[in-house]
Amino acid sequence: MENLNSYIKGHFADSILVKEQILKDENLITLIKNASLEVIKAYKNGNKTLLAGNGGSAADAQHIAGEFVSRFYFDRPGIASIALTTDTSILTAIGNDYGYENLFARQVQAQGVKGDVFIGISTSGNSKNILKALEFCKQKEIISIGLSGASGGAMNELCDYCIKVPSTCTPRIQEAHILIGHIICAIVEEELFGKGFSCKQ
């Protein structure tokens, strides 16, 4: 590459453009708000969040769960949140016995209860193991929030809230997903333990 500076700037510009599109979409902003309110309601009722994804989306699931359990902006009691992507014994047992497509559905069946919130992350919206988990959420009356790319894929029909990032580029979608996850964490933390804190630039 002859001009790496321009290449780097192009990536930043593309990422900023996706976020600007979200910022201008009032329906999408309202959807993020309403999804956050469902998480708050669940926690106020003594429930928990369950999160899942594959690859980079698995990392996002673990990242968001970590913010809930540990802390986000300030010290406060931990909030119950489980990333369904972390226990290698459970993952390999389910994968071996029931197939990869049941990796998360089996855990939702075992650990989820009515009133919990499941956050499924899939850039395509078509990850089979996420879709299977979403189907199980409907059976158990677990609220479902999906984070996807522009089309929403099959998640459109299965999620209570399908938050679709306006991009078809996987890295740009993932960058927006973690920002949305951070925003949800901030709203939940502030509502439950309100200290009025944020890190303004």
From Swiss-Prot:
Short name of one Pfam family: SIS_2
Compartments in which it is found: Cytoplasm
Binding annotation for Zn(2+): H63, E67, Q174, H182
EC supergroup of this enzyme: isomerase
Domain of life: Bacteria
Reactions mediated catalytically: 2 D-sedoheptulose 7-phosphate = D-glycero-alpha-D-manno-heptose 7-phosphate + D-glycero-beta-D-manno-heptose 7-phosphate
Any one of the GO BP annotations: capsule polysaccharide biosynthetic process
All copies of domain SIS, residue ranges: 39-198
Pathway field: Carbohydrate biosynthesis; D-glycero-D-manno-heptose 7-phosphate biosynthesis; D-glycero-alpha-D-manno-heptose 7-phosphate and D-glycero-beta-D-manno-heptose 7-phosphate from sedoheptulose 7-phosphate: step 1/1; Capsule biogenesis; capsule polysaccharide biosynthesis
TM ranges: none
Cofactor: Zn(2+)
GO molecular function annotation: carbohydrate derivative binding; D-sedoheptulose 7-phosphate isomerase activity; zinc ion binding
Cofactor: record remark: Binds 1 zinc ion per subunit.
Enzyme Commission identifier(s): 5.3.1.28
Positions with a binding annotation for substrate: N54, G55, G56, E67, N96, D97, S122, T123, S124, S127, Q174
Key words of the record: Capsule biogenesis/degradation, Carbohydrate metabolism, Cytoplasm, Isomerase, Metal-binding, Zinc
Listed GO CC annotations: cytoplasm
HAMAP family cross-referenced by the UniProt entry: GmhA
Quaternary structure note: Homotetramer.
Miscellaneous field: The reaction produces a racemic mixture of D-glycero-alpha-D-manno-heptose 7-phosphate and D-glycero-beta-D-manno-heptose 7-phosphate.
Function: Catalyzes the isomerization of sedoheptulose 7-phosphate in D-glycero-D-manno-heptose 7-phosphate. No activity with L-galacto-heptulose, L-galacto-heptulose 7-phosphate or D-manno-heptulose.
Family: Belongs to the SIS family. GmhA subfamily.
Protein name: Phosphoheptose isomerase 2
Annotated organism of origin: Campylobacter jejuni subsp. jejuni serotype O:2 (strain ATCC 700819 / NCTC 11168)
